[in-house]
Amino acid sequence: MKSPSPVDPESPSSPDCKGGSSSKRRRLPWRMTMSLAYQSLGVVYGDLSTSPLYVYKAAFAEDIQHSETNEEILGVLSFVFWTLTLVPLLKYVCVVLRADDNGEGGTFALYSLLCRHARAALLPPGGGGGGGEPGDEDQFLDAGADKKAAANGNALALSGRGGGGGAAAGVRRLLERHKVLQRVLLVLALVGTCMVIGDGVLTPAISVFSAVSGLELSMEKHQHKYVEVPIACFVLVCLFCLQHYGTHRVGFLFAPIVITWLLCISMIGVYNIVHWEPNVYRALSPYYMYKFLKKTQRGGWMSLGGILLCITGSEAMFADLGHFNQLSIQIAFTCMVYPSLILAYMGQAAYLCKHHIIESDYRIGFYVSVPEKIRWPVLAIAILAAVVGSQAVITGTFSMIKQCTALGCFPRVKIVHTSDKVHGQIYIPEINWILMILCLAITIGFRDTKHLGNASGLAVITVMLVTTCLMSLVIVLCWHKSIFLAFGFIIFFGTIEALYFSASLIKFREGAWVPIVLAFIFMAIMCIWHYGTIKKYEFDLQNKVSINWLLGLSPNLGIVRVRGIGLIHTELDSGIPAIFSHFVTNLPAFHQVLIFLCIKNVPIPHVSPEERFLVGRIGPKEYRIYRCIVRYGYHDVHKDDQEFEKELVCSVAEFIRSGAAAAADAAASSKPKNVCGGGAEESEKEEEERMSVIPSGSIRMMEEDGGAGAPSSEDTVGGSGSGSGRGSSRGGGGAREIMSPSPSPPPVVVAPRKRVRFVLPAASPRPDAGVREELQELMDAREAGMAFILGHSYVKAKSGSSFFRRLVINFCYDFLRRNSRGPNYAVTIPHASTLEVGMIYYV
């Protein structure tokens, strides 16, 4: 256990200077890497592998026509080849995958990585970021943490902020000093997140609709238009209705389905190349892109909105990085996905080079290039592959919503873990049904691949542009590379993506308005929730009660201490929340052991159990008042209430036993009390300095029913060693136990609800009398039960506020609060043990 020292509650571990975790960068065995590469084909590449279903159809929708010179089809193939080569292969596989945040990827991972290397966080403090206020202690790497890292010789902890040369230092200072730039950074991350959510609506629609559209070549045209949309909607409804069962039961089929699909389209491509046009490889020359744009001009530029669909799903390589590793994703793409897609697109182009006559029922698309004898089996495989690709996008949307909720940027929703083995497999009921309704509405409303492609393309390219912008900052701030390299990265890839973005945006009235509207709605929800949460925290910060107020409570004020443990939730990691003073003022009593619990969702993926709990003491030890800060990463799974209660009590017991409490008391007594106006602040500073990291598992707590009986007398040693005469310790073969006394025989009318004993580590020294007395009182309180005091705040705009603030706070934020779930820690708390304290916050 670490000794009491200035500990930053927002920085549980030292970030790697490159953003990756050492555990993730360890080289895995070759067999395991290949197994992960195989699995990634079904999870990561389902969406990307189904893009040949609709790319040519979207590119030749109306903007350009297929002529006998083949310049159009060869130009489109050239654009497809170089887009696949430059964006997924060069940008993502070679560069972006290296910018992981402790093994995790995605837009928020890049944002969290940047915030840890510069004081640029504007996330709600209870949800993973500093409030951004001057002097706020909730920063990722404060001066105290830097001193501690330097004292421990940990250069890596300082490398995130201290090194990097003039360019990194200059960019860091620019971000830290200008709130506008910090807001721009947060807005970029939120825009990318909103577009990912929009992609979760559009990708299932276009993938399933395009797969089902193969029926147009197998039936009459007047019959097809009445069959295509109902079948697509039926498949989509089944897909969303099965989400709550999870994917672990059928997940083993995902990789074989995608592999079968990739082999199928690549073999069809080879057949078409050999049979129709072996010289189609000429289109791999960039010269054909120039010829294409020169001939088609504005029509060719607008057709780029359909061509960019060839890279839809590329962002999943980075977003799903946490489930695999960098090498496995690179192997799967370069060895299987990339060559299969190139062969598929070349095969379609080879077929179209020899088929120029456009009949009344003829459309350029994937299925026209499939030999008629195998068209039905290919149709079945295509539908299965589209379902797999859609499933991956839906799961990714759930994961993104979970990250936003954990970081305080989205209203709380119900998160169901569908697998006991894989923590990333989650299901969010509210989001699932919203996605289904929107997906069905778009499918029924558009009924056309062209409009669906325009909508999906804009969402895809916007996310990629956001990644490019954030990645250029990572190159400077986190990798400490030259600023010219960062400029080169953003200019090269930004120019390519801006070209596609402009081609998509110009089709606003033809479907591209959908992702913009969806992003605006989700962006408004996120901004309103973020604004209301920040204002609520600022009210807590400004109205918190000094520790001296709590220490001044004396028996003559009528304060009563009752048996048990009182667990008071607060979003503050220092001081006393205003809601507790409100509670004590109206009900002058609190428990014999009081724990102020602060749950922090920090902007890193995972917090190790050894660094999860921070424990400190408030006031003299006779008060039995503690503060506990529990830190979770945005991918951590919250435990159930019973397990959490045990770990919480054990962390306090370990704090008492290990000597950290004695060291904290000595540190407190050695400092003179400040009785001037700044005494409260000084006391809070001293208290924060006494916070200690408590590793889990040092002390185990055993609980038995009250009637289980006392241990035998020969197992009990030193029964009165505690000074109070109530505790006993038992020596075993490998551990020492401190037990509560046996329940008394018949005069006792009400037996304790449970008997508690702490099992100490085998090598631990015998605790002294003061420690035993404090542990004994903690055991007595645990036996009496634990009560949860939860604040229920109503946020209202204060009088004199502007109309806009009253609209946002009194109506929009209040509506979101009333329709969101309660905090995660409160979901499984027994209602009989919960006391809610209501208070109105005027902000």
Swiss-Prot record:
Expressed in roots, shoots, and panicle at flowering stage. The keyword Membrane applies. One of its GO terms (biological process) is potassium ion transport. InterPro entries: K+_transporter, K_trans_C, K_trans_N. It comes from the Eukaryota. Pfam families: K_trans, K_trans_C. It is a multi-pass membrane protein. Its main location: membrane. Residues 718-735 have a biased composition (Gly residues). Residues 1-34, 94-183, 247-249, 320-326, 399-425, 473-482, 532-843 are cytoplasmic. The chain crosses the membrane at residues 35-55, 73-93, 184-204, 226-246, 250-270, 299-319, 327-347, 378-398, 426-446, 452-472, 483-505, 511-531. One of its GO terms (cellular component) is membrane. Residues 56-72, 205-225, 271-298, 348-377, 447-451, 506-510 are vacuolar. It is found in: Vacuole membrane. GO terms for molecular function: potassium ion transmembrane transporter activity. Residues 1-25, 667-747 are annotated as: Disordered. Residues 1-15 have a biased composition (Low complexity). Keywords: Ion transport, Membrane, Potassium, Potassium transport, Transmembrane, Transmembrane helix, Transport, Vacuole. Belongs to the HAK/KUP transporter (TC 2.A.72.3) family. PANTHER family: OSMOTIC STRESS POTASSIUM TRANSPORTER (PTHR30540), POTASSIUM TRANSPORTER 8 (PTHR30540:SF10). High-affinity potassium transporter. This is Potassium transporter 10. It comes from Oryza sativa subsp. japonica. The lineage of its organism: Eukaryota, Viridiplantae, Streptophyta, Embryophyta, Tracheophyta.
